[in-house]
Amino acid sequence: MMRKHVMAVMMAAAAAMVMAGCSGNNSEASKGAETAKTEAAGTQEAGTVPEAESYTIGIGQFAEHGSLDNCRTGFLQGLEKEGFKEGENLTVLYENAQTDGGTSSQIMDNFLAKKVDLICAIATPIAQSAYSAAKDTGVPVIYTAVTDPVLAELAAEDGTPVGNITGTSDKLPVENQLEMIRTMLPDAKTIGIMYSTSEVNSISAIEEYKEAASEYGFEIVESGVSSPADIPLAADSLLEKVDCMTNLTDNTVVSSLPLILDKAGKKGIPVFGSEVEQVKIGCLAAMGLDYISLGEQTGRMAAQVLRGEKKAEEMKFEVIEQAAFYGNSA
C-alpha cells in the first residue's frame, strides 16, 4: 500500500509538470525538418486510388519490439486511410532483421528482386541498408523511427533527402524526459543509459542527454554494448553506479528490456522508458512519442509517393513534435 501511495504522489507530480510545462514545450524538430501537420490525420478523406491499380510494398523492420511494431501498424493504417488497403489494392511483404545488419541488407535485396513499388524501413540501421540497396534502382524508400536522419546520412543538414528517400523521425524529447525524472526523483544525481555502439540513433541521443543533463542537476553514466550478449554484465555494472536509468529507443537494448527491468527491480533502481510500450512492460514512466501516430504520418507520406503526387526525393523528413506522459501505476 505504501508503494502505491508513493507512486500515486509521484505520478500526480509528474502529471502536473506535464500540464504546466511540457504541453507547450514539445520535443525539438531535427534541424531543417518539416513539422507534422496533426490536423491532417483527422480531417483528410481517404485518397483516390485508380481502381485498376495495385501496388506491392516491402516493409523491413530492424527489430521486434513494441514501438517498432506500433510503427508498422500505424504505417498500414495511414496507407489505408489514404485508400491503399492490404488484400485489396495493396500487397505487403514483411520481414524482420532481428537486429542483424547483414540480414537487413538481405531483406532489401529480396524486396528489390521482387520488384516492389516502395520500401518502408523501420528504424535507423535498416533504413541505412534500404538506402544503400535502393539508391540506384528508382525504388523509393520511406523510413520511420529514425532518430537523427542527418547523422544517419539519410538527409542533408537542411532536412532535404540525399536521394529517393524520406520519412519520419522519432527524435526523443530529451529535456522533457529530464524534467520528468527530476520531478519524480528530486534527490537523484546519476542517470544510467545503456546503448548499442553500432546504432547512430543512440549515439545522437546520448550526446543530447549529456549536453542537457547538468541543467537538471544530473550526471549521465553511459554504458555501450556491441551485442545483446553484452547486456547482462553491462546492466549489472551500470546499476551499481546510478540512482536510476532511462532508456532510449535503442533497438538492441529495448529487445532486452525485460532482463534489464528484472535486474533493476531487484536493486530497487527505477527505470524510465522512452515510449508507452516500454512503460507497459515495466518502466516507471516516460515522456515519449506515440509510435502508431508516427507510423500513420509515414503512411500518409508513402501514399503521396505511390499516387505520384510527390517523389520521395522532393520531401523533407518530418517529425512529430508533441510529447506525451505515460505512467506505470502498477
Language model features: what each stretch is:
Residues 276-327:
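Flexible loop/turn connectors
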Residues 97-156, 250-265, 269:
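Beta-alpha junction/loop-to-helix N-cap segments that form part of ligand/metal-binding clefts
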Residues 51, 55-82, 93-102, 198-202, ...:
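Extracytoplasmic "Venus flytrap"
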Residues 57, 75, 166-213, 315-330:
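An alpha-beta-alpha
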Residues 129, 134-175, 273-285:
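Flexible loop/hinge segments that line or gate small-molecule binding clefts
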Residues 23-26:
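Bacterial signal peptide processing site
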Residues 50-51, 148-190, 289-310:
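Hydrophobic alpha-helical segments within soluble ligand-binding/sensing domains
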Residues 18-21:
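C-terminal motif of bacterial Sec signal peptides marking the signal peptidase cleavage site
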